[in-house]
Amino acid sequence: MTSMIPETKITAVRNTLQITFGVNEFEDIRQLTAGLSSALIFRIVVLGKPYLLRVITRTDEISNPSHYYSCMKPAAEAGLAPHIWYAGIEDRISITDFIEAKTFPVSVARMKMPGVLKRLHSLSPFPYRVNFFDFVDGLVRKFQDTKILPGNMTEDLFHLHAKISSVYPRNIQDMVSCHNDLKPENIVFDGDRPWLVDWEAAFLNDRYMDLAIVGNFVVKNDQEEKEYLTNYFDEDVNEYQHARFFLMSQVLHMSYFTFLLLQVSAGNKPVELNSAIPDFREFHDQMWAGKITLENNEARQEYALVHMQQLRHNLNTKRFEESLYIVSNY
């Protein structure tokens, strides 16, 4: 069964098991392939109990888990992430509790996730890495330079994004500890409560980023948005908070759209524009149900275009202009 572990990591994994559990073999192993992490993820059984084994095979500095662990550990101590049994920086191996995933109804997630996010955002500040707006602005410039799509298809979107970028607050004192990658496979529901996993993208960020990511999956109309944000803030939500949420949602659409198409184009695959673009809500419902993953370029391209279509729709609504006005005059 150790054949699943890269030969260069077998000794380190055995040492980890010995240090952690007093044995040097596991009883069962199964590789988990959901998600886009470059690390190898396994469900292992040791002394009759399942655990999650994460093995980072890359040796470059960008794969150094120091930052990842510095965010995961306080989250685990707060009961937001699974218990950590081992987290080695030099060997780049970690072992945590394995949470058996149960179906997480969207209606239940809409009620439970705001409280989880509020607890996450109340943790001591994670390390600062980058301003998310600066990151997205960089994606836009790179996208324009590579000319992945004709300019007449995207020029209006980039122009309107610039309007958001010019008015949206970037006050670092207002930033909180964020996960930044709360897609369905990183939210594991055990039948009672959700656990947050895969902390590679965590850093100090705008709270509305996490709220918008989860909102893509659980908020379907204005009333649900009101309930969702009210549950997070524990008070009636004002027009400024609604406007911040809406504008950050558009920035999120832009980031997915540009990042994923840049990723697809890096493989020298032309963007297919003749196929019908799926409905935003239906696509996210399928992702939430685990029926769609982003493991291949076809799915990533489709998801990018889903976000582009939704972004175009939202930027042409009355709410967009109202939100710009509210935030710029707050």
Q: Residue ranges of each PLM-predicted region?
A:
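Short glycine- and hydrophobic/aromatic-rich loop-to-beta-strand nucleating segment
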Residues: 92-95, 182, 218
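Active-site acidic catalytic loop and adjacent metal/ATP-binding pocket
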Residues: 38-48, 52-53, 162-211, 223
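An alpha-helical support segment within catalytic cores of ATP-dependent transferases
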Residues: 6-25, 125-180, 190, 226, ...
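Active-site activation/catalytic loop segments of kinase-like enzymes and analogous catalytic loops
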Residues: 208-240, 250-269, 280-293, 299, ...
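Activation segment
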Residues: 58, 101, 194, 202-204, ...
